């Protein structure tokens, strides 16, 4: 054992190749007791690869491990002798999660003692507070996996870690003894470390300690400084003190010194990030064994260097001189300044200035200081403090592909079609700069191709944003023209509103869209297209732009014809002679599945189950945009259209779009202005079915709030307040066309949609009817529509009870 060839090559590999951002650190010499002699093992020069753990936070080594010329694989440690290989547990390793550290030391000690490897040592079982503690030989259970209550003592200047219980302490051995074995108390002492290199990453570190060229005798590992950081010792001299021999039965090693790594474990209790005080830092420095050589400590620039004072290194077991504290500036780090690095000084270097290799500091520093001041002839991490910021000249903005591809005969201007879908931004159109003759072809149209069926039904935006391409009558794909960077200039050509405006014909050819002029287009004219007859039939639109197409498929050549056609639809959907206040419309299928909590019935048990989930408050279908939940997945799909802007139901008269077909049907009645929905109780007429339902509640629900000035009853107090305004003559919302006044802005807006001609006066009966209608419509404004069915409730409390 004493003749082992321990090459320092492995240590160089650890500090240079397998470790990045190595910082100079110094520690103390580690000695090891003797073991039975055996043949020398050739050193392959491969180090033990200590796991790459988290950064050290102002901590010093709390556990030490031997570096031997062996290798470590993904699942095991390979020693020089195959029979001594042992397997690591499968990842993830516990020390990465809960402050447990996996030390290679027990296996290495067992290797030296020619015994099977022990198990792991829990870090809490090591007493590092400098007080007298029990020896490990009196606590064999500390070698069991992760025994948190174990107590492994560290005596002054000596870390005692036994690979087994020794007979001298009266404890039973953990392993059977062979005939040639000698009872051994394997002990580590620390002395005369000439240099230690630490591959500590500076990511997210508050403070780091890096020690270079530190010597001392019997240093003590500080409390709370366990941090898993792999360190490598380049060379360790063999100068054990005579007092170490025989201490606790320790037998010193004779021969060349061993190469030693230092394993540190992060303390998750003390010295956290941004939580390290100056006293804690001083305590950590106190315990570093240093006497005559300098120590560099890398700190974050946010640390208050002014609060650091001279550090005294007199502790139990230490007799060292105090060291002075100074700050290394950027000039010193760049090589332009000088700092006193005498043997008794301790210098603090900002972590941003600490480099991996001290020989290349100047080269690496240039990457940190990126702003070069030509007047000062130096670099700064930010603006020059003397001359201020530099002047930057930005690049010329590059126009989009759509604008750059515009032919020279055309220009882009505001379109005569109007504004965008939102009704805010003006649309950009394509105008002619010179005469364009008839049968001039433009194209093909370039855009993004999509095979999604959802995009094929995307009709809420301008029609020319989605172009459907068919092959043998089957939709093949869609061309989307919404991104200027992906399309050409043809995306700006707008659709004509009537036949007089049309001067282009859009037609498909070989899976592409082309525009062809249908007439000579003079200068200063906007290009406006409409579809060819065949293409219009494919996509299901009228053959001419001024034709009104009803949802039933009928084409009307004039607005009057279209209005008359809509009226016929309304008469066909008039309620029957039965009470229209019944809960929900009639259905062709029988609703035999009735809810036990409300009067609703359903055509299938699955729909009843979904409805019942609403009563129970179960809403498993959640919106990814606003976290709103629904019990019915169809309601979620309808709700998602609000976020995506998908409105597939468009009014052919005013181009207003809706997310639901029922909303479109209710909107279409506004254009006719006819009140065809009749109340079965009082024969009052309404335009919208929703208004009729709300009105029926007046007849079916009891009104208990009475007006103090008249005998009229109300359902809510806010209705009474509005009614009192009518007694006082307060109608602040006046129609500019007919001078008719209303109590609320909502009712005035509804009136403006149907107001056709001025009216100077109104009869008293009309005023009274308007007041009643306003009251009824006020109820409809606050009505909560249950999405689980067609039920409507007059109060929020009723809706909650329904759900």
Swiss-Prot record:
Molecular function per GO: DNA-binding transcription activator activity, RNA polymerase II-specific; histone methyltransferase binding; methyltransferase activity; RNA polymerase II cis-regulatory region sequence-specific DNA binding; zinc ion binding
Compositional bias per record (Polar residues), positions renumbered to this chain: 792-803
ZnF (C2H2-type) intervals: 593-615, 621-643, 649-671, 677-699, 705-727, 733-755
Gene3D superfamilies assigned: Classic Zinc Finger (3.30.160.60), SET domain (2.170.270.10)
Spans annotated as Disordered: 757-803
GO cellular component: cytoplasm; histone methyltransferase complex; nucleus
Entry's EC annotation: 2.1.1.-
Pfam families: PRDM2_PR, zf-C2H2, Zn_ribbon_PRDM4
InterPro entries: PRDM4, PRDM4_PR/SET, PRDM4_Znf, SET_dom, SET_dom_sf, Zinc_finger, Znf_C2H2_sf, Znf_C2H2_type
Keywords annotated in UniProt: DNA-binding, Metal-binding, Methyltransferase, Nucleus, Repeat, S-adenosyl-L-methionine, Transcription, Transcription regulation, Transferase, Zinc, Zinc-finger
One record GO biological process: methylation
Compositionally biased tracts (Acidic residues): 765-778
Described purpose of this protein according to its UniProt entry: May function as a transcription factor involved in cell differentiation.
Family: Belongs to the class V-like SAM-binding methyltransferase superfamily.
Protein known as: PR domain zinc finger protein 4
Organism, as annotated: Mus musculus (Mouse)
Native organism taxonomy: Eukaryota, Metazoa, Chordata, Craniata, Vertebrata
Gene: Prdm4
């Amino acid at each position: 054992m004493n003749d082992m060839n321990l090459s320092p090559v492995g240590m160089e590999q650890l500090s240079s190749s397998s470790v990045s951002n190595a910082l100079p650190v110094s520690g103390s010499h580690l000695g090891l007791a003797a073991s039975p002699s055996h043949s020398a093992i050739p050193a392959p020069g491969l180090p033990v690869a200590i796991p790459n753990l988290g950064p050290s936070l102002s901590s010093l080594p709390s556990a030490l491990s031997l570096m031997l010329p062996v290798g470590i694989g993904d699942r095991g440690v390979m020693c020089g002798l195959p029979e001594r290989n042992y397997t690591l547990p499968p990842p993830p390793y516990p020390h990465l999660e809960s402050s447990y550290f996996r030390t290679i030391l027990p296996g290495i000690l067992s290797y030296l003692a020619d015994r099977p490897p022990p198990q792991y040592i829990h870090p809490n079982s090591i007493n590092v507070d400098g007080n007298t503690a029990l020896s490990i030989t009196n606590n064999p259970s500390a070698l069991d996996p992760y025994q948190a209550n174990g107590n492994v003592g560290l005596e002054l200047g000596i870390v005692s870690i036994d690979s087994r219980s020794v007979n001298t302490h009266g404890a039973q051995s953990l392993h059977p003894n062979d005939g040639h074995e000698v009872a051994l108390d394997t002990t580590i002492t620390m002395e005369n470390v000439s240099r230690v290199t630490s591959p500590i990453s500076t990511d997210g570190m508050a403070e780091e300690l890096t020690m270079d060229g530190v010597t001392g005798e019997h240093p003590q590992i500080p409390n709370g400084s366990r941090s898993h950081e792999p360190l490598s010792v380049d060379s360790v001299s063999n100068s054990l003190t005579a007092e170490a021999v025989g201490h606790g039965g320790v037998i010193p090693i004779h021969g060349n010194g061993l190469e030693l790594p230092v394993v540190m474990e992060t303390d998750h209790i003390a010295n956290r990030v941004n939580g390290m005080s100056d006293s804690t830092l001083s305590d950590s420095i106190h315990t570093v064994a240093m006497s005559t050589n300098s120590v560099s400590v890398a700190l974050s620039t946010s640390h208050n260097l002014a609060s650091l004072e001279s550090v005294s290194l007199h502790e139990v077991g230490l007799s060292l001189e105090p060291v002075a504290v100074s700050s290394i500036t950027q000039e010193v780090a760049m090589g332009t300044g000088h700092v006193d690095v005498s043997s008794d000084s301790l210098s603090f270097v900002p972590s941003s200035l600490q480099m991996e290799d001290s020989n290349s500091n100047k080269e690496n520093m240039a990457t940190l200081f990126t702003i070069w001041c030509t007047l000062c002839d130096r670099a700064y991490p930010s603006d020059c403090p003397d001359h201020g910021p530099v002047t930057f000249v930005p690049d010329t903005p590059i126009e989009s592909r759509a604008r750059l591809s515009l032919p020279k005969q055309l220009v882009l201007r505001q379109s005569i079609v109007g504004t965008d879908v939102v009704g805010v931004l003006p649309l950009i159109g394509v105008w002619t700069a010179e005469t364009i003759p008839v049968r001039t072809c433009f194209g093909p149209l370039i855009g993004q191709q999509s095979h999604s069926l959802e995009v094929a039904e995307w009709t809420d935006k301008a029609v020319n944003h989605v172009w459907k391409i068919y092959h043998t009558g089957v939709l093949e794909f869609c061309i989307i023209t919404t991104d200027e960077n992906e399309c050409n200039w043809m995306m700006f050509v707008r659709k004509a509103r009537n036949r007089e405006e049309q001067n282009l014909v859009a037609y498909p050819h070989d899976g592409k869209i082309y525009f062809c002029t249908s007439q000579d287009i003079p200068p200063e004219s906007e290009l406006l297209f409409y579809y060819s007859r065949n293409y219009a039939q494919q996509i299901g639109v009228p053959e001419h732009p001024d034709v009104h197409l009803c949802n039933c498929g009928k084409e009307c050549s004039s607005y009057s014809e279209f209005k008359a056609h809509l009226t016929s639809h309304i008469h066909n959907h008039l309620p029957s002679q039965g009470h229209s206040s019944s809960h929900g419309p009639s259905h062709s299928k029988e609703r035999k599945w009735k809810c036990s909590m409300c009067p609703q019935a359903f055509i299938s048990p699955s729909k009843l189950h979904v409805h019942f989930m609403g009563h129970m408050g179960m809403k498993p279908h959640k919106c990814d945009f606003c976290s709103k939940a629904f019990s019915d997945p169809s309601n979620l799909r309808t709700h998602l259209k609000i976020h995506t802007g998908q409105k597939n139901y468009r009014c052919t008269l005013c181009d207003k779009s809706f997310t639901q077909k029922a909303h479109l049907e209710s909107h279409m009645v506004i254009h006719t202005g006819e009140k065809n929905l009749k109340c079965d109780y009082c024969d009052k007429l309404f335009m919208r079915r929703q208004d009729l339902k709300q009105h029926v509640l007046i007849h079916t629900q009891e009104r208990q709030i009475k007006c103090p000035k008249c005998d009229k009853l109300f359902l809510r107090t806010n209705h009474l307040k509005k009614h009192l305004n009518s007694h006082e003559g307060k109608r602040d919302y006046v129609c500019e066309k007919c001078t008719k006044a209303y109590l609320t802005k909502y009712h005035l807006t509804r009136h403006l949609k149907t107001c056709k001609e001025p009216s100077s006066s109104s009869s008293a009966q009309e005023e009274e009817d308007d007041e009643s209608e306003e009251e009824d419509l006020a109820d409809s404004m606050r009505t909560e529509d249950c999405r689980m069915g067609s039920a409507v409730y007059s109060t929020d409390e009723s809706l909650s009870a329904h759900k």
